[in-house]
Amino acid sequence: MANPEGLQVSPPPPPPPSSPSSSDTSSASSPSAPGVLGWPVPSRSSGRLVDPLEEVELQIGDAAFSLTKLLEATSAVSAQVEELAFKCTENARFLKTWRDLLKEGYDSLKPDN
């Protein structure tokens, strides 16, 4: 889902000159983990800097809301499909009955041999 504000993400600033621990070094090589080193990330709505954990929590909340709406829509469509399947079954029974009656009537009109 694209951000309508057109947020441009710039690469994180270089780490401080202090010597990083071994866990920080492995995290620093990952481009998707700027928050691991404590760098703030820009907020989607206000442009202010927010904690990466807070940003992830916001994204999880947005995803949960979207999934809830999707579940509601899926449930509504499912109910409509069940209703349509029932109607189709009833129509099939009706057509089969008519077919049988027409066949029976046709057979009764045939001359007996």
UniProtKB/Swiss-Prot annotation:
UniProt biased composition (Low complexity): 20-34
The keyword Cytoplasm belongs to this UniProt entry's keyword annotation: yes
Keywords tagged on the record: Cytoplasm
Segments of skewed composition (Pro residues): 10-19
GO cellular component labels: cytosol
Subcellular location: Cytoplasm
Region (Disordered): 1-46
PANTHER family the record matches: RENAL CANCER DIFFERENTIATION GENE 1 PROTEIN (PTHR31641:SF2)
Name listed for the protein in its UniProt record: Uncharacterized protein C4orf46 homolog
Organism (species): Bos taurus (Bovine)
